[in-house]
Amino acid sequence: MSTEPDPIAAVAEGLGRTGYIASRPIALALHLAQHLGKPILVEGPAGVGKTELSRAIAAWQGLPLHRLQCHEGLDESRALYEWKYGKQLLYTQILKDRIAPLLGDAPGLAPALKALDGFSDLFFSEQFLEPRPLLAALREPRGCVLLIDEIDKSDEAFEAFLLELLADHAVTIPELGTIRAIVPPLVLLTSNGMRELGDALKRRCLHLFIGLPSPAMEARIVAARLPGIPPLLLRQIVLFIAGLRALDLKKLPSISETIDWARALVLLHTEHLSPDLVRETLNLLLKHEADISAAQPALAPLAFQAKRDAETGMPLPA
């Protein structure tokens, strides 16, 4: 029997110190990504902790976090770099007096343009470059965590643009050439499944799916965020949520909604769930009016069942 420490458990413990409760698959994916130098594609429904995972990793490792929020129409000028046009214009005005004699002495248009060539490199040099999140991440001297959030909201052209960055930790700027990472960043891409991602992108990534948690895992997550929550109330909350997720709803409550609801119940000095209290606070869990209406008949039975099961003291379903 091996006496070697479990590296996966060590990753989960490290994330736990930041308040992020990681399942073994999450810790395993992170451990492999760190040692294989591969990005992680994190998929799953909204609100299960995909974005928060990047923040937790950065906090645990003591690294800066660079976040690129994807959206329709995103291109490399917004994601990689842009030129400081105001500074370029200012320098143009300052150098105007020096440029004028060169142009005045030129015998024609072609010689004048040739005389200006020496200045063009100046205006498209490092001092006029404004790094955006992707380039800023490559330039971090100690490395960083790079979050490319909601990649499914971008288009296929931007996805193709990312391939060089993900495979080689490098990007190409026409005026400056290829820029490689000082220290390769740990890259996480998140997707809510709005569209199918390309195979080329998937091949370059480790895949991690974060789904809705079991009651036992959700209780650990809520307790980490609300250390003072009464244990019996916590058990009732996660059991009620599990029952609510079994209903045929358009949008099931995620972990973020559970935490918000638990925080509200603590604020209201709740000791146990009641049907009336659940109805009054249901809008913290369900965000569609159709779901709120559809859930009404089940609220009282679910609240009573959660209270009864919580009071038995039996282990929560894992």
Where are these regions (language model features)?
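C-terminal regulatory/interaction module of P-loop NTP-utilizing enzymes
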Residues: M1-A318
